[in-house]
Amino acid sequence: MNATTSLHPAAGLSALEARLREDLAWLELPAPSWVPARTSDGQRVLDVVIIGAGMAGLTASAELRLLGIDNQRLFDQAPAGQEGPWITYARMQTLRSPKQLTGPALRLPALTFRAWYEAQFGREQWRALYKIPRVQWMDYLRWYRRVLDLPVCNDTRVEKLQTRSDGLIELMLLRGAVKGSKDTRRETVLARHVVLATGREGLGGPYVPDVARDIPRHLRAHSSDPIDFAALRGKRVGVVGASASAFDNAASALEAGAGRVDLFVRRAALPRINKLTGIGSPGLVHGFANLPDAWKWRFLHYSAQTQAPPPRDSVLRVAAHAQAHLHLASPLTGLRHEGDTIVVDTPRGRYTLDYLIFATGFHSEIDTRDEFAPIAPHVRRWRDRFTPAAELPNEELASSPDLDRNFAFQERVPGACPALARIHCFNHAASLTHGKVAGDIPAISDGAQRLARAIAAMLFDADRDTHYAALQAFDTAELAGDEWGDADAAAGTVPADTPAL
């Protein structure tokens, strides 16, 4: 392939896919399937179920398959090609991450975004590329899923996840769960391990402050909700928050023709420095999980307090509009509605709005999710066993699940729900235990490899009797016995009762 010449996209991808197949063959990957089949009441038990087929779920599935664990399924409630936030509620123009990060490539060069991009557009265009366009990243993930032939079941919602007395995990699914679809059916599957690859929402969901509860839903939204921005043309729109999503939603409203957008920020100044970027290294990726608990808390508390800044591009995208207004040191002190008009009070003024968007992040309270109700009371949180220093309070961190080294939940009461050890939390809620390896692009491959290796080890241990029996039964000889004779036997000097090894 000429590194400086654009190829026809289809031809370029075809060549790249051939290279990937060759790379995998040279590495003898995927490994042959090795996990003994298990059935229950005549039903084949899945070795691994992954809930969520976004970037984290796909990467985990790919690594499991490379390790020879192919009796697996991914379930995602989104239609095919719409998994994750990238073309739903993510509203930035480009990714924040630098374009050269290898992301979910699992140390396979031909699986990187760069390889995918250059195969279609050439190296010169890669060099000219500023950052990865958001929609193009989704195109890459669709290709990733296809080229690895990952077993995703779309339009499928998990209605209930519960453990059984035999140690298996039962999932009640609603298939065909597209909004408005009448062609739905329920199905129950059994799994030995379940991975919750549920992204930024983690175990909880969108966080909206209590002050907003009385505002009718048609007048407000969370930044992760579907929003009809075209309907906001000429309207007065407010956005609460200083995150990247706050600016992206403000920009989306402005670009759709909003008459005025007011951005309300609690802080007196926008954060300017992404502190965790300053210590990004393999040491952080592989060392965080081994830190003492007090240091884990200290690192993430400081990161939360300093807060990652919105990307400069996102801020400039909003600031370019004359009808955009930034209000610093402006927490909401009052919020009410008068008919279809919202009245916002801050220490610096009163504002009337037609629509209000809360870019206020997510919470990790597992007991707010109906599908997790059977296991939620048993899940140990950090608050159940760890007390931070008095000057370092943080309720979001305190509600994080207290995971083991395998990303698995731990029991609040030992012995009450032992199957939790096979339910793995591979999403944002894992950050306090494992670091930022279960959802962000920079270290997603490292996290997926850690998870998949842990599951492989657990499956082997659980089937050790079967593997030992296979060890004993194995009888493929490598020597025929006629390669070289015993000199002492030929001389007749070996005692007849000499034991064989």
Features from the language model and the residues they span:
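A short alpha-helix-loop-beta-strand transition element characteristic
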Residues: 86, 98-100, 106, 124-128, ...
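Tryptophan-centered motif/residue detector
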Residues: 82-89, 116, 143, 366
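A conserved beta-strand/loop capping segment in the N-terminal third of enzymes
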Residues: 103-138
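Flavin (primarily FAD) cofactor-binding/catalytic cores of flavoenzymes
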Residues: 2-78, 126-256, 262-501
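Conserved N-terminal glycine-rich FAD pyrophosphate-binding loop of Rossmann-like flavoproteins
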Residues: 78-106, 270-287
